[in-house]
């Protein structure tokens, strides 16, 4: 059995050992961590082992090589700024002299500015500079010909008038026109006034026509003269040669008999229209109990009596109506 060496001899042998192999270093790792004497030389010994292993492993191509660890290089700040101080200050002056067009408030109040030469404001009247014009830095087009303010105002007024005239065509048809409009617009009838909602009143450029009683001169009324005769059918006959005339009122207007006609004469039979005229007539009325009739009114405000001659009649006699005939209502329409 081999005799074991004391611990002191083993420690001395380990400190003086020339074994630089990776196995020896690994076997002594526990001892290096527990022995204080070994810790001091472990760093230097490890560097030597790495350099030796690198030299040995360089000859073998199949062995994996550890990457070399290089120390971080820290460059001082003084070496980073390679430009000298004089050059830095001169470039700052050249750069900021363009902006020294106002006095520095801090330098004017306290006599000291923390920015020193880097300040963009002037430190005193000697550094104060006049601002340069824009033409020196930027190329500008030649100045345009200036016009008088009055001519420009006239152009603006013309543009406004054109825009307002184009907008007025679509805004409202009853808008009050200007003086340059023709008088043809006055001949048109205001439809808003007929509906009763014209907001322009007398200032409207369209005609405000009051709805008055219009009478059709081609209308003829056929009715029984008295209650003694059998009740025939009353017709409102409109002659076909005047059918193109439009009567804008829903109810027909009847004509009064002439004043020179004989009162109380029987209603002539020949005045009843023929069959073809009845087919061309517009409405047909049933015999109802009348209460009032419309009568035309002349310029003096008095009822005006008129006469109508039926061209289809065989004789030349006039139509005769009894007293109070036109004070009764018209007959109802048979639908």
Curated annotation (Swiss-Prot):
Required for inhibition of Ser-2 phosphorylation: region residues: 288-291
UniProt GO molecular function: DNA binding; mRNA 3'-UTR binding; zinc ion binding
Crosslinked residue numbers (Glycyl lysine isopeptide (Lys-Gly) (interchain with G-Cter in SUMO)): 68
Chain residue ranges for the region called Disordered: 130-188
Biased segments, Basic and acidic residues type: 130-156
Main localization (coarse): nucleus
Taxonomic superkingdom: Eukaryota
Keywords, in A-Z order: Cytoplasm, Cytoskeleton, DNA-binding, Isopeptide bond, Metal-binding, Nucleus, Repeat, Repressor, Transcription, Transcription regulation, Ubl conjugation, Zinc, Zinc-finger
Regions of compositional bias (Polar residues) in chain numbering: 158-167, 177-187
Disruption phenotype annotation: Disrupts blastomere cell fate. Excessive pharyngeal cells produced during embryogenesis. Reduced expression of nos-2 in P4 germline blastomeres and absence of nos-2 protein. Does not affect embryo viability or brood size of animals. Abolishes the sumoylation of hda-1.
UniProt KW Membrane keyword: no
PROSITE patterns associated with the record: ZF_C3H1 (PS50103)
PANTHER family xrefs: CCCH ZINC FINGER/TIS11-RELATED, PHARYNX AND INTESTINE IN EXCESS PROTEIN 1
Subunit structure, as described in the record: Interacts with hda-1, let-418 and mep-1. Interacts (via C terminus) with cit-1.1 (via C terminus).
Domain remark in the UniProt entry: The C3H1-type 1 domain is required for degradation in somatic blastomeres. The C3H1-type 2 domain targets the protein to P granules, is involved in germ cell positioning in embryos and is required for default nos-2 expression.
Protein name in UniProt: Pharynx and intestine in excess protein 1
């Amino acid at each position: 059995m081999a005799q074991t060496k004391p611990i002191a001899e083993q420690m001395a042998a380990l400190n003086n050992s020339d074994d630089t192999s990776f196995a020896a270093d690994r076997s002594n790792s526990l001892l290096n961590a527990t022995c204080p004497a070994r810790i001091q030389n472990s760093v230097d010994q490890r560097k030597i082992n790495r350099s030796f292993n690198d030299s040995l492993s360089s000859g073998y191509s199949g062995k994996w090589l550890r990457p070399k660890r290089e120390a971080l290089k820290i460059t001082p700040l003084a070496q980073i700024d390679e430009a000298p101080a004089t050059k830095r200050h001169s470039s700052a002056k050249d750069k900021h002299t363009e902006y020294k067009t106002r006095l520095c408030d801090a330098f004017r109040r306290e006599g000291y500015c923390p920015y020193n030469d880097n300040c963009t404001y002037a430190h005193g009247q000697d550094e104060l500079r006049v601002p340069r014009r824009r033409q020196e830095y930027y190329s500008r087009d030649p100045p345009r010909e200036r016009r008088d303010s009055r001519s420009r105002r006239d152009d603006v007024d013309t543009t406004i008038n054109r825009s307002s005239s184009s907008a007025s065509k679509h805004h409202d048809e009853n808008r009050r026109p200007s003086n340059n409009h023709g008088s043809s617009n006055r001949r048109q009838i205001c439809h808003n006034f007929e509906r009763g909602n014209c907001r322009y009143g007398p200032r409207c450029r369209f005609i405000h026509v009051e709805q008055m009683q219009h009478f059709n001169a081609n209308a003829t009324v056929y009715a029984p003269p008295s209650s003694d005769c059998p009740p025939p059918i009353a017709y409102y006959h409109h002659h076909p040669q005047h059918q193109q005339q439009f009567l804008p009122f829903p109810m027909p207007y009847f004509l009064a008999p002439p004043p020179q006609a004989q009162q109380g004469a029987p209603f002539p039979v020949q005045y009843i229209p023929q069959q073809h005229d009845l087919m061309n007539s517009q409405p047909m009325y049933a015999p109802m109990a009348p209460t009032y009739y419309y009568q035309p009114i002349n310029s003096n405000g008095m009822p005006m009596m008129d006469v109508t001659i039926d061209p289809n009649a065989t004789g030349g006699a006039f139509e005769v109506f009894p007293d109070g005939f036109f004070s009764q209502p018209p007959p109802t329409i048979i639908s």
